[in-house]
């Protein structure tokens, strides 16, 4: 399935049904009086955040959405049927903008609803205009037009841990080894072309990890493919920075990613970061020790190591402990597309 995280959609809510102008006509009743009913309301278009979807691909094939009009009122004081609402599920983390780019709402929690296009109100039938001085009104009102607009949808993935690093650092391999993600893995840059989600379970605790496609120098300006996905890092609670230990200059590798984060948004550099030296099975212990020490001196942070054979449980447990310590983080439920 294609990963679509932006879409432009035309919405037209239903028009309200017209009110009815009619009079009661029955045998032996000479002056039956007005009995025109109200028109039904037009259908609205509603978006609801759901873990059942994780991409905006629905809008790739459905770019024009129109709700049903309300039915006109009828005689005998019968109200017209209201148009059916259209309710569309969107991924948790979907932001809705108007055409000018102004944020309308942010659907960032499960089952959060928002009426994006309101249906028009039904018209009033002539029976409602009857008064003591006007016993036989003939006038009625037309139904109101429903809202009509273009909107822009943008998806920012919500996850506990955002996995970042240069292309081919082993991010996808790490995700696949500790979760049930079936992401594509190969020994060349930009294997991952779209964010991948995986769910790890440590001591019955769920940890959602997002593999962000590899960033390169200049990603914030559009180089490589990272600029399309830097926004997804904003919704991650913490960052796991994976570095290929076989690189000659691991400090430069680290600084490259940190620079791109700061140039995109200073807030990204303020997120808690854990550093993982990957592919340690390709070097001897002395080389790993030297690189680990150099990186620790530069970053002033604890450096973790990983290899194909080494269990990932230790680093995952540390990540979960850190997230659980922060009571301000409201852990969302994220759909795992491979656990169905």
Curated annotation (Swiss-Prot):
First-tier enzyme category under EC: hydrolase
Chain ranges of the Obg domain: 1-158
Sequence positions that bind GTP: 165-172, 190-194, 211-214, 278-281, 306-308
Keyword Magnesium: yes
List of residues binding Mg(2+): 172, 192
Positions of the OBG-type G domain: 159-325
Keywords tagged on the record: Cytoplasm, GTP-binding, Hydrolase, Magnesium, Metal-binding, Nucleotide-binding
Compartment(s) where it occurs, according to its Swiss-Prot or TrEMBL record: Cytoplasm
Biological process annotations from GO: ribosome biogenesis
Sample GO molecular function, one term: GTPase activity
Pfam families: GTP1_OBG, MMR_HSR1
Entry-linked HAMAP family: GTPase_Obg (MF_01454)
PANTHER family, sorted: DEVELOPMENTALLY REGULATED GTP-BINDING PROTEIN-RELATED, MITOCHONDRIAL RIBOSOME-ASSOCIATED GTPASE 2
Protein role: An essential GTPase which binds GTP, GDP and possibly (p)ppGpp with moderate affinity, with high nucleotide exchange rates and a fairly low GTP hydrolysis rate. Plays a role in control of the cell cycle, stress response, ribosome biogenesis and in those bacteria that undergo differentiation, in morphogenesis control.
Name of the protein this chain belongs to: GTPase Obg
Provenance organism: Ehrlichia ruminantium (strain Gardel)
Gene that this polypeptide is encoded by: obg
